[in-house]
Amino acid sequence: MTTETAPITLYVDADACPVKDEIYRVAIRHGLAVIVVAGGFIRVPDDPLITRVAAGSGMDAADDWIAEHTGPDDIVITADIPLASRCVKAGSAVIAPNGKPFTEESMGMTLAVRNLMTDLRSSGEVTGGPRSFTPRDRSTFLSTLDTTIRRVQRQRAARIQQQS
């Protein structure tokens, strides 16, 4: 295996993740490890590349587990904005299930909007939640995931080459 195809790990915040099957297929195609983290039991394919972690039933147990284990050569898939922020700070690439990448540049505004919407919902000024997940979201996610995998592999290869 060359440094350009060195393995990276995908961490999945699996509770309510609508793209788990897509993640498994892409990861297996690229030969990447997947760690599926949930608050409790979750069914995963029987594949040596895929590992399940039951992080416990605490409020943020799965989020805490993911944040404590990710780093620069990892990709995190989550819709949880505070978790995304923690993982971006750790150097991980982070993607929402709708394909939106979370970056250092976007996290401040994303957190501010999330906090504003939480306040508006709690005051009753805004009702309802996010829009429904669409086939277009699924397609965007797949495209973003492939692009992110290639980018992280290139970054890792460049870092390994510099260390040589």
Swiss-Prot record:
InterPro entries: UPF0178. It comes from the Bacteria. Belongs to the UPF0178 family. This is UPF0178 protein BRADO3147.
